[in-house]
A protein has these predicted regions:
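Active-site-adjacent structural elements in enzyme catalytic cores
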Residues: 1-324
Length: 324
């Protein structure tokens, strides 16, 4: 079993991370969305170690992270005009673009496909790591496959202790949900996965109407398989039932509640109230799911949010978490 070290961002930890990556090892690092489990993007063997460490299906591609546009040109065949507009508007930030891959990117990273998912993360520590390495980093979320995504180093350690040698602890992730994913190969943006960057903002920056295909896409990481699921049962409830205190099952042993609206009834042993809009809910969601697990909750009642704006991404994750 690998000994796992947790270090704060520093010159020393950065040098250790680069040494590990150059030797074919894996490093978990913070981004503004969720923590990533990184390997050298041009190293097929290292990419396969990512899949093994996570227990990730091999048909689920990885996202390639770059620190600047110069690095991007080695990853993709061509930056389309649409991709250029979206990059200018949102990079560095929580937006992943689907483009045709270059010959340098191995099939182990793209699940054998001809396209690559690529983004420039909006977290200084992530970009510093990529810049120090001098090449892109392929990284899915740093959790066991199917589990809630990690938004703290403690979440990563809980899932991957003994599977990864180094975790860079950059504190809690600001956004708390994975990046939006957009197919930018054509003239119109195709939203393959919703994120905290809304579809409306993407359409405005693109200057073109967007398409949102139904179901999963083989091009997009994180849409094909079961994701975001804690060990406890997740039950989605509308705000009106929370405001009325009309959740009979909440009185049962092992029940918990995550909510925004005021709860007038007796609070269960595990209860998390998130104040603010859908963005605040997004930032707190995965931590709440993991905290409920740790508290021994068996049935977790989670208040829904309106299915618009950032709420689309929140509801996408909640529906997947509730799926059995």
């Amino acid at each position: 079993m690998i000994r796992t070290h947790v270090l704060r961002p520093s010159k020393k930890s950065l040098a250790a991370a680069v040494e590990l990556l150059n030797s074919g090892g894996l490093v978990a690092f913070p981004t503004e969305t969720v923590y990533g489990l990184g390997a050298r993007a041009y190293d097929a063997s290292a990419a396969r170690r990512v899949y093994k460490a996570k227990g990730r299906p091999s048909d689920n591609p990885l996202i390639v992270h770059v620190c600047d546009e110069a690095m991007l040109t080695d990853v993709v065949k061509r930056v389309t005009p649409l991709a250029r507009r979206l990059m200018d508007a949102f990079w560095p930030g929580p937006l992943t673009l689907i483009l045709e891959k270059s010959a340098r990117v191995p099939g182990a990273v793209t699940a054998g496909g001809s396209t690559v998912a690529v983004r420039c993360p909006g977290h200084a520590a992530a970009r510093a790591l990529i810049r120090a390495l001098g090449e892109p980093v392929a990284a899915p979320s740093a959790n066991l496959s199917g589990r809630p995504s990690p938004t703290t180093a403690a979440h990563v350690l809980r899932d991957l202790r003994g599977r990864v040698a180094l975790i860079i602890d950059g504190g809690p992730c600001r956004k708390g949900l994975e990046s939006a994913i957009v197919d930018a190969r054509g003239k119109r943006p195709v939203v393959l996965r919703h994120g905290t960057l809304t579809a409306e903002a993407i359409a405005r920056a693109a200057g073109a109407p967007l398409r949102v295909p139904g179901g999963s896409s083989p091009l997009s990481p994180g849409t094909k398989h079961r994701h975001y699921a804690p060990s406890c049962r997740v039950i989605l409830v509308p705000p009106a039932l929370v405001r009325r205190g009309a959740l009979a099952g909440l009185s049962a042993a092992g029940a918990g509640l995550v909510h925004r609206a005021p709860w007038p009834g007796r609070r269960p042993a595990f209860a998390v109230r998130v104040r603010g809009g859908a963005g605040s809910y997004a930032a707190a969601l995965f931590a709440a799911l993991r905290d409920a697990e740790a508290a021994g909750v068996r049935s977790l009642y989670v208040e829904t949010v309106p299915d618009r704006g950032v709420g689309r991404a929140v509801m996408d994750r909640l529906r997947r978490a509730a799926r059995r």
